[in-house]
Each structure stands twice: as C-alpha cells, then as structure tokens.
C-alpha cells in the first residue's frame, strides 16, 4: 500500500532528497502550549537553535486541511495568533483534513507525519504518558503507542510529575521503546532534572545516540527511541516547589471538570500563573535545549543513513 505523503516546503523537499540532517518540531506548543507572543518567539528561536547546530528545522502542522512539513514565517504567525485552531493527535488527522481545519499536531501526530516525510529525529518539550489512576481510567497517552510503532527518535525532557512515571516507563518497555538518558542515569521530569527513576540506558554523546538509532533500526524493531535530555541546571525548578504547584493546578482542573484534550493546555497555563511566569521560562529553555541535542543527533545520523541507503 502506498502511504500518503505530507506536503513539504521547498527547503524541506530539497533537504530530505539530499539526505541533509532535519529535525521535526511539533506545533501544539505554538497553538496550545504557550501564550502569544511567547509561542511565536519560542518557535522561531527553536528553529534558529537547530540551524545553528547544523540541521534544518521542520515545523509540522495541519494547515487548512493539508498535512504540512516545513512552515513559512507567516504560517507560524497565523498558528500562533488564531483562536479556532484545533489540537490533533494521530487519530484526528483524517477528520481535520476532511473538514479543512488547521491543527496543532501533538507528539503522536508529529511523529506520524515526520515518519511519512522521512524525518528521523524529532525535538519536543515532553511526551505524554500514563496518568495516575490509569488502572481505572485507562488514560494513557497516544504518544507512547506511537513510539511503539513509528521509527522516530524523540528528544524530550522526560514527562511531567503529574503523570505516573513508573507506569510510563513500564509501558514504554512493553512497547519495546528504548529510553536513553543523555549524560545521566536519571530519567528527568520536565521542569526538574530527576524524577526518582532511572532510564534504561545512559549515552553521553550525540554520536553514540545516532549510532544506537542506526543499529536499533537495522534490527528491524519498527519502534522509535525516547531520548531523555534533562533541563539545564540553571533553568530547573525546585522539585518540591513545582510538584506542589502542579498538584494545585491538577486540583483546580478537577474542580472545573477539565479533562482530555483540554487538560494539558489548562495545566500549563495555570502552572505558569501560579509560578508567576517561572514555568514558562523553564519550558522555553528546555525546548531549546532539546532542539540543540536533536540537531546534533540528526547531524551525526545523516551519514549513517546515507551509508545504509
């Protein structure tokens, strides 16, 4: 079966055809993750970081019903300011296309579209996971199942402490997804460098990670890899402070009956309010840090992929 291909920007089409290093970027951080203009400034800043480290950024979104890989400045501006843009997971893409909607793509949708476009490395803030109480609610992010079926390396700062981190790591093991921590043995928890849990593996250079990616795919596993990159020490928030703040935000969400797709945007906004903007600053820095590592991995991986082909 011939699979659908997203529409590539000219720069993206040329880069992929040439085997140049490319890093995919999600768009829900623009449409639902941050307020304007911080969302646009962050998106442009992250793209700049990727270019400075030798790779080409590929921001991914649905634009008026069309799957798009590589966006122009005016398109990023529209995503950043428009109010009617939906949030699309992998399961939502077909309906968004039928309706001609514009959508910010979640981690799972971005992974899917990156894979269809032939992009191997993806930088994001954090991934979804297994929610606390999932044994009753079955609330498990599609990000985890997509990692188990899509050959994309996802560079992130771990998961937020609102999730059941132990069960998230167990679920990734079930999905045969290697969890590799960069420069540490600890699995990070987004705003903090340590979650109290260990990652499966530690690798200390982008070149090692790229080689692990190459060998992983040569084994025919068909799964992605999760690269856990701790937030820079200078930007990390105190664990007790942020854990208490997150607990307060979750309590507020429960009292207001907010759940499902609306939950994460609400929590991010509420946490930013409760921390007086400190969580937003940390979020921006960790995304840029992940983009930097992702670009270096993509640069190291590109010649390995060319040799394989």
From Swiss-Prot:
Belongs to the pseudouridine-5'-phosphate glycosidase family. Mn(2+) binds at residue 139. The gene is psuG2. It comes from the Bacteria. This is Pseudouridine-5'-phosphate glycosidase 2. Binds 1 Mn(2+) ion per subunit. The keyword Lyase applies. It is an enzyme of class 4 (lyase). The keyword Nuclease does not apply. GO terms for molecular function: hydrolase activity, acting on glycosyl bonds; metal ion binding; pseudouridylate synthase activity. Pfam families: Indigoidine_A. Substrate binds at residues 87, 107, 141-143. Catalyzes the reversible cleavage of pseudouridine 5'-phosphate (PsiMP) to ribose 5-phosphate and uracil. Functions biologically in the cleavage direction, as part of a pseudouridine degradation pathway. GO terms for cellular component: cytoplasm. Its cofactor is Mn(2+). InterPro entries: Indigdn_synthA-like (IPR022830), PsuG (IPR007342). Its EC number is 4.2.1.70. HAMAP family: PsiMP_glycosidase (MF_01876). The active site is at 26 (proton donor), 160 (nucleophile). SUPFAM superfamilies: Indigoidine synthase A-like (SSF110581). Keywords: Glycosidase, Hydrolase, Lyase, Manganese, Metal-binding, Plasmid. Homotrimer. GO terms for biological process: nucleobase catabolic process. It catalyses: D-ribose 5-phosphate + uracil = psi-UMP + H2O.
């Amino acid at each position: 079966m011939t699979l659908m291909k997203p529409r590539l920007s000219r720069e993206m089409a040329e880069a992929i055809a040439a085997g140049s290093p490319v890093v995919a970027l999600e768009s829900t951080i623009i449409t639902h993750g941050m307020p304007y203009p911080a969302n646009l400034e962050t998106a442009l800043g992250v793209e700049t970081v990727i270019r400075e480290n030798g790779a080409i950024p590929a921001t991914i979104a649905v634009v008026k019903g069309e799957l798009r890989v590589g966006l122009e400045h005016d398109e990023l501006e529209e995503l950043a300011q428009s109010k009617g843009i939906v949030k699309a997971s992998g399961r939502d893409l077909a309906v968004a296309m039928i309706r001609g909607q514009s959508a910010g793509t979640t981690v799972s949708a971005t992974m899917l579209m990156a894979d269809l476009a032939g992009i191997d490395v993806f930088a994001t803030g954090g991934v979804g996971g297994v929610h606390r109480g999932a044994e009753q609610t079955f609330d498990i992010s599609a990000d985890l199942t997509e990692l188990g079926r899509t050959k994309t390396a996802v560079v992130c700062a771990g998961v937020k402490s609102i999730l059941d981190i132990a069960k998230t790591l167990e679920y990734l093991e079930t999905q045969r997804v290697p969890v590799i921590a960069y420069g540490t043995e600890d699995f990070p928890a987004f705003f903090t460098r340590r979650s109290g849990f260990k990652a499966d593996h530690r690798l200390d250079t982008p070149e090692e990670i790229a080689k692990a990616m190459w060998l992983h795919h040569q084994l025919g596993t068909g799964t992605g890899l999760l690269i856990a990159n701790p937030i820079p020490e200078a930007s990390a928030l105190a664990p007790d402070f942020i854990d208490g703040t997150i607990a307060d935000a979750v309590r507020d969400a429960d009292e207001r009956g907010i759940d499902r797709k609306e939950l994460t945007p609400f929590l991010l906004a509420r946490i930013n309010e409760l921390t007086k903007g400190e969580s937003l600053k940390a979020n921006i820095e960790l995304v840029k840090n992940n983009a930097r590592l992702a670009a270096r991995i993509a640069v190291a991986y590109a010649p390995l992929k060319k040799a394989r082909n």
